[in-house]
Regions:
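Kelch-like beta-propeller repeat domains
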Residues: 1-382
Length: 382
């Protein structure tokens, strides 16, 4: 298997290439079923952090968290306490309070969970607040992309082994009021399934794929929370095969899915779904791909790059002693002035953020469990 090129801090990645991200310090152990979130920077011009929560390996489930500090390019292990061990859970950050991280559901070795826990980043302790309303039944529900505003939306999930939970009810948790509800929906919802992806784009929720027993799905459903009507979308293009345990993120008008498994085994393909055109595209890469995997995590992160500014202010007529005009219409006449100003301009640079897709961990169908970070550029470059 070919190794991926390592992307260094502030290095600008090339389009259509995968890279390895290798922060310094102690990285998490190999794991599956964890979640991954981007935490915006608390200070001006900061790069932010990536937090990985929970997960499991054959020895047990985890109650830890790891952070990648994008400013220092280092792993950090926060001393947060109180998280119940869990994997294949959901996590989200409310829009109105970016200092709070919520987790829901998942499982540990003794069975499925349906509890909620809250971490306030300033306090640094996981809490189990009292909530009202009827919660979903215990289930696995592996996502970090199913929240709109302050609300987490839950549909389907795993019961035991290959079997999904029986209900096809939409469950909504409002973190502002600490309330569960089951709003009435219209139209035909997706069939019972687990291992699907559920991704929010604006006021719409998209569900793709999943598994029920031995049946893999490749369908795509949409629910607009403004009218609460389910719609099975008629998609076209490079439609992915039926798959489950894949990951999804949304950026702009596109949804990206990576990996998972189908009837042939683990996958390492990336597909892009155009929401407006209802069309799938399988993305092609000029580099090796990450190892095939399922039950990993994925998120969008900003990546600070440093770009050299090229000189665009001067026109060379072939005679440096002649009067020259820059693009602003100002005249310059001395060769020394021209050369010095060109040197100053060419030596300057600017910083900007581009968007990358990051995947961490997961496993293949042969039992190989990963602890690697892989990234690729996604924003308007395909």
């Amino acid at each position: 298997m070919e190794l991926l090129q390592v992307l260094e801090p502030e290095e600008c990645p090339e389009k259509s290439k995968w890279y390895a991200l290798v922060p310094c310090g102690q990285s998490p152990s190999s794991r599956v079923g964890h979640t991954c979130l981007y935490l915006p920077a608390a200070k001006d011009n900061g790069k932010g952090r990536i937090v990985i929560i929970g997960g499991a390996n054959p020895n047990g489930s985890f109650s830890d968290a790891y952070i990648i500090d994008l400013d220092s390019h280092e792993w950090d292990i926060p001393d947060w306490e109180g998280l119940l061990p869990r994997y294949e859970h959901a996590s989200f950050i409310p829009a109105s309070n970016s200092d709070n991280i919520w987790v829901f559901g998942g499982a540990n070795q003794s069975g499925n969970r349906n509890c909620l826990q809250l971490l306030n980043l300033e306090m640094g302790t996981w809490q189990s607040p009292s909530v009202t309303g009827t919660p979903p039944s215990p289930r696995t529900f592996h996502t970090s992309s199913a929240a709109i505003g302050d609300k987490l939306y839950v549909f389907g999930g795993g019961d035991k082994g290959p079997d999904p939970v029986e209900d096809t009810q939409l469950h909504v948790f409002d973190s502002a009021t600490l309330t569960w509800s089951q709003p009435e929906t219209y139209g035909s919802p997706p069939s019972q399934r687990h291992g699907h992806v559920m991704t929010a784009v604006g006021p719409k929720l998209f569900i793709h794929g999943g598994l029920a027993g031995e049946k893999f799905y490749n369908d795509m459903f949409c629910l607009d929370i403004n009218d609460m009507k389910w719609e099975k979308l008629k998609v076209k293009g490079d439609v992915p095969s039926g798959c489950a345990a894949h990951s999804a993120v949304a950026f702009g008008k596109h949804i990206y899915i990576f990996g998972g498994m189908d009837i042939s085994g683990a996958l390492n393909t990336m597909h892009k779904y155009d929401i407006e055109k209802q069309s799938w595209t399988q993305l092609k890469y000029d580099s090796p791909l990450p190892p095939a995997r399922l039950d990993h995590s994925m998120c969008i992160i900003p990546w600070r790059v440093c770009t050299e500014l090229k000189n665009r202010n001067f026109v060379n007529s072939g005679d440096d002693n002649k009067l020259e005009e820059n693009l602003e219409g100002k005249a310059v006449s001395k060769r020394e002035d021209l050369h010095q100003r060109k040197k100053d301009e060419e030596g300057s640079s600017e910083e900007r953020d581009i968007q990358l897709c990051l995947i961490f961990g997961g496993m293949d169908t042969n039992g190989e469990i990963y602890s690697d970070c892989n990234i690729t550029i996604i924003d308007d470059h395909f």
